[in-house]
Amino acid sequence: MSSLPVAAVLPELLSALRHAPQVLLNAPTGAGKSTWLPLQILAEGNINGRIILLEPRRLAARNVAQRLAELLGEKPGETVGYRMRAETCVGPNTRLEVVTEGILTRMIQRDPELSGVGLAILDEFHERSLQADLALALLLDVQQGLRDDLKLLIMSATLDNERLQRLLPEAPVIVSEGRAFPVERRFLPLPAHQRFDEAVAVAAAELLRSENGSMLLFLPGVGEIQRVQERLAERVASDVILCPLYGALPLSEQRKAILPAPAGMRKVVLATNIAETSLTIEGIRLVVDSAQERVARFDARTGLTRLVTQRISQASMTQRAGRAGRLEPGICLHLLAKEQAERAAAQGDPEILQSDLSSLLLELLQWGCQDPAQLSWLDLPPATNLAAARRLLTDLSALEGERLSAHGRKMAALGNDPRLAAMLTAAEDADSAATAAKLAAILEEPPRGGNSDLSAAFARQQGNWQQRAQQLMKRLAFRGGQPDADSIAALLASAFADRIAHRRGQEGRYQLANGMGAMLDADDALGRHEWLIAPLLLQGSASPDARILLALPVDIHALIEQCPALARRSDIVEWDEALGTLKAWRRTCIGRLVIKTQPLAKPSEEELHQAMLNGIREKGLSVLSWTPEAEQLRLRLHCAARWLPEEAWPAVDEASLLASLERWLLPQMAGVHSLRALKALDVRQALQNWLPWPLRQKLDSELPTHYTVPTGSRIAIRYHDDNPPALAVRMQEMFGEATTPTIAQGRVPLVLELLSPAQRPLQITRDLGAFWQGSYREVQKEMKGRYPKHVWPDDPANTAPTRRTKKYS
């Protein structure tokens, strides 16, 4: 084994681990970094404590553990063990544990010091899974605050060294060149006129005919694997075995795909990107790369994940091609043009930038970290997705302010997806716990085959579900319960209330309680049910409606009886403007879904008034009768806030008045029971009564409604939103006034509109004194001829004012 490529850098690596808290190892697939190196570190690395080796996938974790144990002549559970969901194989003498991602996070949460652990190894880190990024952030925090003696080794086939070195500038970088045979890389664009699965099968069959050896065929998803397998089966010889390989396959089926082909046989492994790096598949010499992958992208707006088929990065193409050169010179056929390959992105996007972050946020809050920026990340979790995660945790009653509630702490301790954790913690006895545990097991590994009826899946006795349910029952500290189909709906509603669905007019179309649309296949038998709970949804790319993958028919009225808190009852009164009347009814809702509506014979005055206020807010203040006096009062208050800002004037713009209807309008509405009475309401009086007495006095003295001119006439002042206040007065009544009158403690001059005897404007001025001494002369000349019976003095500033003609002056 010492001939493995990574053996050449072992002394350098051991030295780095002795002297540095973090070490980066870059070693290509097949170099021995997973299946040989950990044993050498265990034997020679002077590690003080156990070694934890993180593998991103369950199959890889089990295979690595078995291989390491074989090298020691042992079985897993002795020196080398493994831990994964629903399966643990460790013993009292285990010193090297191979674990999957969620398991490592649970270990850190339960024992933040990682007592007894000397080294944590993160393998295949280039895959940048969400859990791997979280594990790195938590481990670095442990090193900084609790365990400066803990060692961390980050291993990858294609490390993003530049970014990791920015995050860990002191970490030594060890590079193993690896051992790979030459790979001839060919490029073949698929014909545009041919179906994808047909074209891929033709290209793969042709390569099999012209070359010897087994083949690894990369496809974006399970559907493509199944369809290409059908097409390829028609085209290959009898000595070729077709083996699918994807994450949802049972582990026994996955193992068949990675074992060598029987003697005299060839094998074609049809795989998703699960086979890019973390699994060693025996006997592969040929690779056909569809150059596509299917990735999950979270939509923060809908709270759903959609699957997107996209071109892979150049780094992934290189990894896929490398699979052909592990044992001998090989061939990789990329199913796209070389120019397209060269234009592909250099690296793929990490999961943390495009995933649902509710589980991550729950883990961070359990860790005591309210702000993710407090930890060290290669990529900071996006604020938009974090906000969506916070909304979900709030809806699940997991938060009190910025921290976890008592319920949230129970959820976090389980280590499940937040919705499933909420459902599990809702169990109150052994039977409901058994029901919740089985439901969680089903939703973690949903059934395949197109049956969307959750009740049918629940009735099945499937081994992996039963094993997982038993594990969850232990976590819940319940024993002996029996799953009860009658409690499924209530348990689902505790975590998926927003996914209660009501059938719309079209067949298979539903509306969810969160307002979104959802749909079943047109021929799905579930479509005959009026109400469903749909815990498993997928956001489609072709339709705005989500696709229902798994759902339960429910009796909505029985569900509300079981879970009264689900429903919101409200008495609603709305006006019918066409009829000039108010309509009242009692409405029962779950989210945005109306369950039942009943007429209300006699709503209370409070309900009537609230309906009127709601109607005003919807239609605007114009529904009230704004007399000129009411509008002028509003404008005086508006101006007072600008001119006398030292006083606490109420805001009277439309938005503010609508927001404060309960404070200024409602007190005037006693006895108002109809729209006619509402329209007769005195708005001016309502605004005036809203003002405290001192402010009312201040307003009347400093922004009066009228100004008394020299003749003693009280002339109305006109106030405006944006223009200065104006006074329209006959010029003769202003004789004897030497300067422009002011208001608001002398801060604001009035604009004088000086009128002719016929009430037509002669002059508009804000400086009366300057007008008397200046342009008045021109006005005097013209007016003497036009209105000879009126007084037009040479010195108006010192002439007695008059309302009369000369005859009566």
For the regions a language model picked out, list residue spans one by one:
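C-terminal accessory/binding modules appended to enzymatic or scaffolding proteins
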Residues: 686-748
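P-loop NTPase motor module signature
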Residues: 1-423, 538, 722
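Short, isolated positions in well-ordered beta-strands
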Residues: 181, 518, 714-716
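Generic recognition of stable, solvent-exposed alpha-helical segments in well-folded globular domains
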Residues: 12, 32, 36, 59, ...
